[in-house]
Design a protein with these regions (language model features):
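An N-terminally biased module of ancient metal coordination in phosphate/nucleic-acid-related enzymes
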Residues: 1-73
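Extended substrate/RNA-proximal surfaces in nucleic-acid metabolism proteins
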Residues: 54-123
């Protein structure tokens, strides 16, 4: 029998709908043997997913999806696996990316508000 795996999963720490532990339970229930949590620009959910995975004897690979811009308008998403989620420099970089994303999101909300669409960041 082939080993089922999904190596590109987002949790509620980025744009996913399920918490890391919920993802582990969901994929375990669907007979996956390996998953990777690869949230956008953060590794905050990886440790809790790995703990849940250990309890269910399922491999959870540490991962991240980093957004970057190559040249002027070429946006890239780079997936990283087996990363050190406790690396201080990684934490610094992801915090910078988080602040930039929050600033961009606020600007988008302001544009939408001027067009008559009132939304909050939670929306």
């Amino acid at each position: 029998m082939a080993l089922k795996m999904d190596l590109h999963i987002h949790s509620t720490y980025s744009d996913g709908r399920l918490k890391p532990v919920e993802l582990v339970r969901k994929f375990h229930g669907e007979d996956y043997g390996i998953i990777a949590i690869t949230d956008h620009d953060t590794v905050k959910g990886v440790a809790e997913a790995q703990i849940a995975g250990e309890a269910l004897e399922m491999k959870v690979i540490s991962g991240i999806e980093l957004g970057t811009i190559l040249e002027e308008k070429l946006k890239l998403h780079i997936l990283g696996y087996y990363i050190d989620i406790e690396n201080d420099r990684l934490e610094e970089v992801t915090e910078i990316l988080k602040k930039a994303r929050e600033k961009r999101n606020q600007a988008l909300l302001e544009v939408l508000d001027k067009q008559g669409y009132t939304l909050t960041e939670a929306d």
